Amino acid sequence: MNILVCVKQVPDTKGGVKFNPDGTLDRSAMLAIMNPDDKAGLEAALRLKDQYGAEVTVVTMGLPKAEEVLREAMAMGADNGVLVTDRVLGGADTWATSQTIAGALRNLDYDLIITGRQAIDGDTAQVGPQISEHLGLPVISYAQKIREVNEAEKYIVVERQYDDRYHVVKAQLPCLLTALAELNEPRYMTPGGIFDAYAKEITVWGRKDLKEVEDSNLGLKGSPTQIAKASDKVRKGAGEKVELDPAASADYIVGKLAEKHII
């Protein structure tokens, strides 16, 4: 079984974010991590490797620095890493990104493709389903548990989150899953895994290596959506706790609202 896992290097947004004048994220000002949903998807692939002897190839699109998440993935147990990087691919929205990744994946053999549900730097949840559409594959989104993989009959059974419930979905292989962070707890890298990861060669592809993709669907020029404006959310100050009897508390709160001209 050949499993492809799409991962993305994203800024760690827990400490807040900074923006460039053009509205894009200032990634140089933040630590870079593997997107959490993608990491859960990687762990799912590695568990299938442990169980079925699958070969796991991790693919990322980004700047040369994105090689770091491929090394991390291989240190966790992935077999191969592919970096798709080219200046002409920069500024891509979800449409152009999915076209790029699909063009890269056409070079590889696969029985299953796993992506994260969404990236924390965009939160669109669009790229995974778009890749499946470009490749003509069935997609199961919001995967929270893989119940069964049948290699002989080529199908997979997955629990798909649906509000506070879940669907049990069966799909023929090859197919694409988008994984929730709750799918599982990713394993840690091991010293031996780190050593092996840095001993391996990363495959690097550019525009010329993408199959069946028109230039009009790539990069900033091929992106039908662009950022009009972006800003950090206003962070609220600490709240105030009122510990008076009910009548006095009500009077106090009304007074505070009046001070701020809310009432």
Question: Where does each model-flagged region fall?
Answer:
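N-terminal glycine-rich FAD/FM-binding segment characteristic of electron-transfer flavoproteins
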Residues: 1-263
